[in-house]
Every structure is written in structure tokens, then in C-alpha cells.
A protein has these predicted regions:
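Terminal substrate-recognition subdomain of acyl/acetyltransferases
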Residues: 1-15, 106-107, 116-197
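Polyanion-binding and phosphate-handling cores
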Residues: 43, 49, 58-60, 68, ...
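Conserved hydrophobic beta-strand within the GNAT/NAT acetyltransferase core sheet
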Residues: 79, 113-117
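Conserved acetyl-CoA-binding loop-helix of GNAT-fold acetyltransferases
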Residues: 84, 89-103
């Protein structure tokens, strides 16, 4: 990923979606971009994978302007549904959004991602982050667009999450592994004679 200009973080933030309101923001952006601009059928855009994925929402001065989705597989993560409102294209918000997504993927210990991009956008993606077209994979089409598959190498994270993590760290909200979670504040010592439910 090309470096994110430090001043971009004064204007943009990218966070994991954890609430229904956050998911509505994601849906609104994707509807504006994919359903309206690209005339994608609803059932193709909202394909049954949203509730088993991690979503990030990009905000510009608190206003939702972009989103992406990550799905998790055994050996790789899959980068999907990157959408920016037209007014945000060509601005540094995309790099803020991708950096946040790549940080989560790296922290989980993944070394690579796959992306399925519209072939016409290959020049944009090849300039935005280090990736390569996957050789031997033929183009494919849906919703009236030609797609290609790309591989994105993810650098090793020095604090990747492991099997031996502190139990509280891995029950914290997605992407907030270094911040004490609600369950840590609810810890009560067992009372004499108490039994597990």
C-alpha cells in the first residue's frame, strides 16, 4: 500500500462495523455505488455473505463515504466490495480505508489476500497497492463487467494474534484487540459455593 499521508487521518477515519447502524451506512454506500451507478442487481450485490464478513466504513469528517468487506478463508483473506462515493474518488480516503483493512488482515496472521477487480480498474489498483494479476486465471464476467483476480501480499505483523493469546484479547471486538473490552470490566471473583451455569 502506498503510504497514507499523515494529514489524511485528520480528515478520514476507517473503522470496523460493529452495529446495525454501521451496517446501514455500508449498505447505503454500496447501494449508491453498485446498484445506482453500476446498475448491479440487488441480489448480486447483497449476495448472502454480508453477515459472515468483516466490514469497514470510511468516514470523512464523520460522514460515511466509503466501505469495504473482508471474508476469511483458511489460507487467505478476500478483499471485496470496495466502494467510494463519487466525490471521494482520487482522494486519500481510499488509502486510509485500505490501510485499516490490511492492518486487520495482517494482525490476524494472513500473508496474502485475493481480490476480484473490474478489469478496467487494474491501472488504479496496481498504483494503489502492491498486487499482481494471478497468472493462469481467466477473466470472468458478472453484472455486465469483466473481472480479474489479483493477489495482494500482506506484510508480517509483529503483533499478529496467535493461538496462545491472552483470552481477553481474543474476545475483544474485531480490530480493537489492544483496547480493554466490556467483558474485562465485568469480571467478578467467584463467590463461595458458586457453580457454573
Amino acid at each position: 500500500l502506498r503510504p497514507v499521508p499523515p494529514e489524511a487521518h485528520q480528515t478520514y477515519s476507517a473503522d470496523v462495523v460493529r452495529t446495525l447502524d454501521g451496517y446501514h451506512q455500508v449498505s447505503a454506500i454500496r447501494s449508491a455505488v453498485f446498484l445506482t451507478e453500476q446498475d448491479c442487481p440487488y441480489e448480486e450485490e447483497f449476495d448472502g455473505n454480508d453477515l459472515c464478513a468483516t466490514h469497514l466504513v470510511l468516514k470523512r469528517k464523520g460522514r460515511p463515504v466509503g466501505t469495504l468487506r473482508i471474508r476469511w478463508f483458511a489460507e487467505f483473506a478476500k478483499l471485496e466490495r470496495i466502494a467510494l462515493l463519487p466525490s471521494e474518488r482520487g482522494r486519500p480516503g481510499l488509502r486510509v480505508l485500505l490501510a485499516a483493512g490490511f492492518e486487520i488482515v495482517s494482525r490476524k496472521g494472513y500473508a496474502r489476500m485475493v481480490g476480484q477487480i473490474q478489469a478496467r480498474l487494474w491501472p488504479v489498483w496496481s498504483r494503489t497497492f502492491k498486487c499482481r494479476l494471478i497468472e493462469g486465471r481467466a477473466p470472468f464476467w458478472f453484472s455486465g463487467y469483466e473481472y480479474r483476480e489479483i493477489e495482494i501480499s500482506i506484510p508480517h505483523h509483529p503483533q499478529k494474534l496467535t493461538f496462545d493469546e491472552d483470552p481477553y484479547r481474543i474476545i475483544r471486538p474485531e480490530g480493537a484487540w489492544d483496547e480493554p473490552g466490556i467483558l474485562e470490566s465485568s469480571v467478578l471473583p467467584p463467590t463461595k459455593g458458586s457453580k457454573a451455569a
